[in-house]
Amino acid sequence: MFVPACGGTRPMPTLEEYSFGTAEFVEELRENFFEGKKEEGVGAMESATAAPLRELGERWRGACGNRCSSAVRIIDLQKKSSSDLTVRVEFRLQGWAREDSPERVAANVFFDLSLFRRRTPESFPDGRWQLRSALAVNGPAVIQRGVPHLFEEAASRGLVAPHEPLDPVESTNLCLPATHHHPGVLLVDVDGDGFIDVIVPNRHPRLFLNDGTGHFRDATAGSGLDLLPEMEASGGVAADVDGDGLADLFLSNHISPCRLLKNLGNGKFRDVTQEWGLAGLSGPFTSAVFFDADRDGRVDLFVASYGDARVTGPVYDGRNGGGDRFFRNVERNGHPFFVDETAASGLGDVGWGLAAGACDADDDGDDDLYVANDFGKNGFFENRSTFGHPFFVNIARTNGTEDEGYGMGVAWGDYDGDGRWDLHVSDYWTPYRWILNDSRWPMPPLPGVGLVRPYMGKMMRRRSGGDALFRNLGGLKFARTSEAAGVADGGWAWGAEFVDLDGKGREDLLVVNGMFRATTGVDDEISFWNAMGREGVNFHDGVWGGIDFGVNGMASRTPKRLFWNRGDGTFEERAFVEGFDTLEDTRGLAYADLDGDGAPEVVLSCFRGPLHLYRNAWGEGGGRVVVRLSADHGLNRDALGAVVRLRVNGRVQLREVRAGSSYLSQSSHDLLFGLGGAKAADVIEVRWPDGRRDTLHDVPAGTLVTLVEGRKEKRDFLRR
């Protein structure tokens, strides 16, 4: 796609032009070494300089016997001269070991390729690139092998709810997220039968009730959701707000008023938006969080707000969003009533908010709040509330979590097993960061723009550096470990969660990604980046409104990420070999034990695509414990903010009951633990929201523990 250049009509640079023609050359390398094609004139294919590529190609063809595929992309380029440069490339290989085998094989391999060209009549008269050397960046390539443990079964289990997008042409819509940023998904026990149900925010929200085996029926008709007017509901959050033991529902909207619905039981809801104090809550709202901000026993509400791209763009720093909102639950006339205390609480940030997650990050008994903002800096809001007086202070700049970028998802977990909460922020990683170093990268036609070009390029490279993993050092200090841990490249990332998929007692990390698919099959992310230099001049017309969503795609059909926890502070990406292989443009991600075996299933929502449900086959064997909590007084019956520590074989695992995380989504309130092969958990310690504690000993593997605060626990067997 061509878009107008700043100040003129000249076509902007293409990938081939930015790469000085090397993009075509590395494609030829891929075809020769990994597809078995022999191209004329590529040069040096049989020489010693190509030996590392040739050796990998031979190994790959020996490992992959069926449906083998390969892809390559340039992720960095260093130019020495017009005829001498180095490119760093990633080869992504995947396929099946044999036609008659479920075993999959995959490899992601990085090479630094030194390239040159000469324009002499005697040697390479066409001036084509030649390979001087190929150096594997991380040593010899490892070819992964594995039989999948995740199986996509949404349709066969009755979970069918096509996404209902708005008009695909952004220029006709009111704000950017209403068209391309949703939907999310909520996993919550709606009808109180102990089985996790599914709510899908949508133009017409949907409810799917679980029959207890992980199969679902569409129960939308007659639920009260069917009485709601058409909306842009993209996300939501569910928790027991009124203390009756049933999960109430909040739906966030971008244009229409947000909705709050009381759970009447038996899968029925009633709209209480006005009655409970939230009438007229309209704006470009995204993710929401229920939590008890001031420890008064009532569930409060935080809603992140985006911005309206038609009015003004984020102006590089993204400090002109709609303004996040905080509502304190004061209880009135015997039912919840929400009062806007945004200003007094300190939670009225004006970034372009997309995601939020509450967590007691400093283990002081109250939940802090992290907010991920698009186009700028994120916020870490330390909770300094007193009883009845919510108050937060943004300490992101001083505690190491500001993470300037394009924040799109929030996940809390303890990935290194040290008993402290770590933080993952989904962000934007692009393989095209290197074009921002190029003098041809377009800038707006402003006086003195040449002076700020180095600053602009540096800022944009910093913002597009990928996901942020922050290790908790204690004392509310964090260190970014994304690159060292191997999780920076999440693609154009959205939903994310820490979850122990394989039951080994370590939290893995799931990240979903993708923007939108083209009707032509053309991915035109380069044009997006060509336009981003004008972000602060006119974002809607100059950047987003200049993209024809009906024709050209962007960062679409990208592999999702399953970062398997090695147990040494690093992760191995294993999505394809484990079966987490959808190429849909995914948004929301949530997990829950849907079939009662203790293992987490994963549900994804997709932009212009179907729901996905991944059944977990690692659950077979019973080596898990599930903890289900209920407070015995006050309105916070779901025990939001309760923290559970499970100790087994000298190691500690950490979980917290939350409502709202990932991106526009919510995972189950049940807390899932893997015992790593142990026969029992040695100790389970529960710290309730009011500070009281309970301790359980010798809890066998394969147990569902239901614990009401202050009472003896009930133990049931998980399904095997």
Which stretches of residues belong to each language-model region?
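Short, aromatic-enriched amphipathic alpha-helices that serve as compact interaction elements
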Residues: 1, 16-33, 37, 52, ...
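Beta-propeller domains
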Residues: 201-211
